[in-house]
Amino acid sequence: MIYHEIYDVIVVGGGHAGTEAALAPARMGLKTLLLTHNIDTLGQMSCNPAIGGIGKGHLVKEIDAMGGLMAIAIDQAGIQFRTLNSSKGPAVRATRAQADRVLYRQAVRTALENQPNLDIFQQEVVDILVENNRAVGAVTKMRLTFKARSVVLTAGTFLAGKIHIGLDNYAGGRAGDPAATMLADRLRDLNLRIDRLKTGTPPRLDARTINFDVLAKQHGDAELPVMSFMGSVDLHPRQIPCYITHTNEQTHDLIRNSLDRSPMYTGVIEGIGPRYCPSIEDKVMRFSDRNSHQIYLEPEGLSTIEVYPNGISTSLPFDVQMGIVNSMKGLEKTRIIKPGYAIEYDYFDPRDLKPTLETKAIEGLFFAGQINGTTGYEEAAAQGLLAGINAALQVQGKEAWFPTRDLAYTGVLVDDLCTLGTKEPYRVFTSRAEYRLLLREDNADIRLTPIAHELGLIDDARWARFNQKMENIEREHERLKQIWIHPQSEHLAVVNELVNSPLTREASGEDLLRRPEVTYDKLTQVAAFAPALDDKQAAEQVEISIKYQGYIEHQQNEIERHKRHENTLIPAEFDYDKVESLSNEVRAKLMQHRPVSIGQASRISGITPAAISILLVNLKKQGMLKRGEL
């Protein structure tokens, strides 16, 4: 049976990628359908109950700057907020929030159900409908076919998912949910490279059986940060602490003595796991010189007894898991509510994607999330947003859009994936971004909100708030430029208390703020420079832009130099075999990756600057040398 209504965009999967992928085209005015195997698990946090962190918080801010949901949802569901790296420079500061799983899921579902132009339908998808090499719909398990002009697939860990606990395993997409086996089989028939990855999760603990009195507490920040540019502390629910315990030699001995029952160490699991979120088995074996590992006990919500022990992800048998838990301080009598497990799943080689996340093999088919080889809610959501935007733009007949590496962490993520691919679950770090001083959390809206407005992604309220902020920044810059302190000023004594060396000549407010020891808050406490802006976001921008002006300008100049060739396009029909001066190895790599620009080509492993120079010469010889927006 064919459903009577034809959609502009169909999104398959209701996780973190799927929700953003569905909301984006709906906000742009396109008729969108979200297909999910279970409406009750929309926005489900399958692993750790937290949003944000180093690099990840930057992605959340970018999603929010473009009208996405994740930041608003965590502001409504966060039960502990912290700013990480708060003592370091603004480029690496990151917001992290512990989440109440139920509140987060409720916030996501409410947003989806109240979004105009968006329909939700509960059914497992078993096939992507492809006609004339173009995705035109999806087929459900009850043989109901939905037609659409583009399709976004966000299947997470469900494609041929296999759950491992000890040497036992069974099909599953995550604990309690079935694997998408039929869809995985169908996708293997398409012209796409597929491999396997693995991830894992720790056992969940019963809070009533934990001795919190002997454990160290970890509170959130006294001055609570917010995640969304439109957010407020008033949105936050009650805040609660986390707790800290540690593994010990008894724990490690138990793990080492149980490796013959580990699916990873006996070769049962073939997929590669996330490097930066290793299992406790991996940590014990890889860091054998350490006699202890720190474990964070994170409450899963305000209305549940479940506790997430961050740091002991494991696929060891249940009896070993019990031993691991009970070997730690404060957990001697703790009961496990849910066992930890590892899950293997299919993922697609992201080098087979365009930077828009459309597959190169099938028009109108977009991939987002863990099926592209990433790990993390934030990475998934950022991809979902981008895929949803481009699915909509394609339907509208408009030019595709994606952020470059100097514009957003989302751009770094997508460029790394599409250019280099990945053999292990990929996560974002600030260290992956060469222009991180420009890609800060605090300026994500300045970088991306005007683009979002042009694309039709944000509402009038957000646009008005953004413009008011920009006006406040401009006015405050001008005000601080105009206020001067001279050696005879009545305010000199107060100013000299702020600075390390007394003033010997006149200085403006901007001059003083450039000094490392002077903050905006301290400066505006001086009567001459009062009052401070009420708009805290604008005040932060004023301080950062003044204090780091020289570094920012240097990085902008570096970007301009790089861009001279970054956006030089390589035509799809360019024949590398005719470039005889390239080595066979370089030619093979270029033909395999088919980079769309010189910038992409330069980031392929083994492509030297000399090879790039040869490419440029040959493009010019053949009259193909042109720059443009990708």
Curated annotation (Swiss-Prot):
Gene3D superfamilies (UniProt xref): FAD/NAD(P)-binding domain, GidA associated domain, C-terminal subdomain, tRNA uridine 5-carboxymethylaminomethyl modification enzyme MnmG/GidA
Cofactor: FAD
Keywords: Cytoplasm, FAD, Flavoprotein, NAD, tRNA processing
PROSITE patterns per record: GIDA_1, GIDA_2
Subcellular location per the Swiss-Prot or TrEMBL entry: Cytoplasm
Binding locations of NAD(+): 273-287
Listed GO CC annotations: cytosol
Keyword Flavoprotein part of the UniProt annotation: yes
Residues annotated as signal peptide: none
Biological process (GO), any one: tRNA wobble uridine modification
InterPro entries (UniProt xref): FAD/NAD-bd_sf (IPR036188), GIDA_C_N (IPR049312), MnmG (IPR004416), MnmG-rel (IPR002218), MnmG-rel_CS (IPR020595), MnmG_C (IPR026904), MnmG_C_subdom (IPR047001), MnmG_C_subdom_sf (IPR044920)
Family: Belongs to the MnmG family.
NCBIfam families (UniProt xref): mnmG_gidA (TIGR00136)
Task performed by this protein: NAD-binding protein involved in the addition of a carboxymethylaminomethyl (cmnm) group at the wobble position (U34) of certain tRNAs, forming tRNA-cmnm(5)s(2)U34.
Name of this protein: tRNA uridine 5-carboxymethylaminomethyl modification enzyme MnmG
Name of the gene this protein is made from: mnmG
